Amino acid sequence: NKYGLKDKIQDGVILHCFDWKLSDIQAELPNIAKAGFTAVQTSPLHQKENAGSIWYMVYQPHDFIIGNGLGDEAALRSLCKEAHKYGVKIIVDVVANHTNGSLKNVSARLQDESLYHDYKGYCNDADRYSVTHGRIGMWDLKTEDPRVQKILSAYIQSLKACGVDGIRWDAIKHVGLPSENDSFIDNVVDQDMYNYGEILNTPGSSNPDKLFKEYTQYMSITDNTYGNDVTQAFAAGGTSKLKGNLVFRGIKGNKLVYWGESHDTYSNSGRDAWSKYVDQQFIDRSYAIMAGNNDATTLYY
């Protein structure tokens, strides 16, 4: 393509169009391509309960069917078709680990409690079982259940049919691996698409590097600690607390996704929203380092 964009998403950089309407993304495609972004990541597009503009409600699925306030199936098809003219790929954020905090706020087919794990505790990063079976404020889908897999697989294939090139798997560390007798990743993740999963800090076990490596057999993963550390080091004026990236722990660079800040570090509340108070120049410097890493891709928020 005339913009010099990469053929593979992992080889380029990604623009996170967080909570943008699909029509607005489409209107900005000329500028996005000129800026050098190989891919655009949308917010989740599944149905959600009517909760106004609260950003995190799109991370609490009502049903796994395309269409919410950001756009419907027709808008997604239009976006993908137009994006491909510029050489821009489309990634859609998908929430597969959980639904809502109340089953009253999900569709009838998702109100069956047998579709969810019956572990009553919350997740604890020191306990892997609780990470994959516990709740993070929402009902935790039984991802090893063929019924759940069928629903999610159909949703992924509907996105693919619209022209979507890749999937960002929200909270993937909370979804069990094949070695843990959960066949979700084997049966639902489409390896003909680009896939990367959100793993914040640790997958939660006494041997996290083993789990990191297993996830990367199926998809790229986020290395949030590295990006956050670099940004905070610039802001603090020193690098004494830098620990290095996951490459130093045996994870291949072509399986990593970096950022200088994320929608969570900016939009969350309290201490979790630290990056909104960091001067943009420091975030920009962090992004320069992230994007300069060989093999890894970088998500620009």
Where is each model-derived feature located?
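Alpha-helix N-cap and loop-to-helix initiation/capping positions
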Residues: 71, 147, 277-278
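Glycine-rich, aromatic-flanked loop segments that form ligand/cofactor-binding clefts
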Residues: 37-45, 79-101, 105-124
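Active-site-adjacent substrate/metal-binding segments within catalytic domains
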Residues: 17-20, 24, 42-53, 68-70
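Aromatic- and acidic-residue-enriched carbohydrate-binding clefts of CAZyme catalytic domains
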Residues: 8-12, 48-81, 109-142
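Active-site mouth loops of central-metabolism enzymes
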Residues: 11-23, 138-151
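Active-site-proximal helices and loops of the catalytic beta/alpha 8
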Residues: 1-13, 27-33, 37, 44-61, ...
